[in-house]
């Protein structure tokens, strides 16, 4: 999974301060204001497109801290089918 993080970080031109994988029960990932990306340990058990979506989503928050128009536009550019993903945990 960290290989995918490196791929997406390069593609999105961001550099997370720390990437950690841990047990998460309510979310698939998060991005802190201090640049820490946290991914759910069981994310790796999901399909590759969903994993890419979550990683891209969290890393993109390093550039755009909200879910506004710029964020959704960039998500559509990088992960065109992201709106069809079932993100509920």
Describe these PLM feature segments.
Residues 1-53, 62-89:
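Active-site-proximal or metal-binding-adjacent scaffold patches in catalytic folds
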Residues 58:
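Walker B catalytic acidic pair
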């Amino acid at each position: 999974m960290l290989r995918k993080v490196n791929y997406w970080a390069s593609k999105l031109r961001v550099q997370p301060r720390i990437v950690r994988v841990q047990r998460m029960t309510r979310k698939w990932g998060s991005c802190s204001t201090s640049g820490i990306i946290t991914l759910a340990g069981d994310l790796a058990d999901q399909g590759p497109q969903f994993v890419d979506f979550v990683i891209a989503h969290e890393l993109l928050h390093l550039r755009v801290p909200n879910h506004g128009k710029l964020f959704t536009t960039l998500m559509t550019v990088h992960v065109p089918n992201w709106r069809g993903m079932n993100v509920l945990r």
